[in-house]
Structure formats: structure tokens, C-alpha cells
Amino acid sequence: MVDDSTRKTLSNIPLLQIRAGPREKDVWVQRLKEEYQALIKYVENNKQSGSDWFRLESNKEGTKWFGKCWYMHNLLKYEFDVEFDIPVTYPTTAPEIALPELDGKTAKMYRGGKICLTDHFKPLWARNVPKFGIAHAMALGLAPWLAVEVPDLIEKGIITYKDNC
């Protein structure tokens, strides 16, 4: 189910140990530390391989995440806002990643711009609780979604390049 490139990417993202969500206040801080360490490592790996494609930050509690992601297509950079909340049942329940500006532009999206991850990602997440975290959701959820959907939306003329200069 996972190709060699994805397997290599995954092997370079640290697996998490602590099984805690936002409801477990004391342990959540420790889980959040693991999340940040995994995200930092994933971003460093992406930069080293020339495939840097997102920036994330969170509120103080680590329950709301937001930032930017981008996809390069025909040497043009398409940039999108990305956001998600950490579910109260996390890490059992994966975060629902949203790209609000693409809401309603593709069938592979739910209301509010939440990307569809049901068929491929969620079963993989369920098998890897609590080892998977936010970095894994980005690598296995958002990255492949962008790779499939953005070129299709561009070719259909649904999204167009915006020059940010």
C-alpha cells in the first residue's frame, strides 16, 4: 500500500510514544513535545531533500494548528492556508486537515475545506496509534492529497496561479 518513496519518508519521521490527547492535560504537554520534535525532523528532512512544502504553528495549548502549504506545478508555486484542530479523542482520532480556500472545489473534500482521507489514510492511522502524529498526517495525508488534487484542479481551471510578487 505504501510505495518506496513514502516508506523512506516515513522511516525518517520519529515515531511517537506517548498516548495522550488534549483532555489529559499533564501528559498532553509531553505528547506535544514529541509532536514538535517529529515535525521539526520532518521539515529538516524535507529541506535537505529540496522538498520543503509547509509551515505550521499552533496555539499555546497545541489544539489548533494553522499555517501554509504549497505545491509546485510546472515551476509555479501554488500556496494554500492549512488548518486543523486536534480532536479531543486524539491520537485515536486523526486530525481533519482543511484547506479552506479550496472548499467546494473538489469532490475529495468535506464541508469547510476538510480534505478526504477516509479510504487510504485513516485505516493506516488507526493501525499506528499512538506512533503516528501531526508530521505523519502531513506526510501521509496532505502531501499525497495535494499531489493528486492540485494538478487536477489546475488543469480544469478551477485554481489559477497567483503571482505573490
Swiss-Prot record:
Family as reported in the entry's similarity comment: Belongs to the ubiquitin-conjugating enzyme family. UFC1 subfamily.
Origin superkingdom: Eukaryota
Segment forming the signal sequence: none
Keyword RNA-binding: no
Keywords, sorted A to Z: Ubl conjugation pathway
GO molecular function, one term: UFM1 conjugating enzyme activity
Name of this chain's protein: Ubiquitin-fold modifier-conjugating enzyme 1
GO cellular component terms, semicolon-separated: cytoplasm
GO biological process assignments: protein K69-linked ufmylation
Catalytic residues, chain numbering: C116
Pfam families associated with the record: UFC1
Cited InterPro entries: UBQ-conjugating_enzyme/RWD, Ufc1
Species, as recorded: Drosophila mojavensis
Function: E2-like enzyme which forms an intermediate with UFM1 via a thioester linkage.
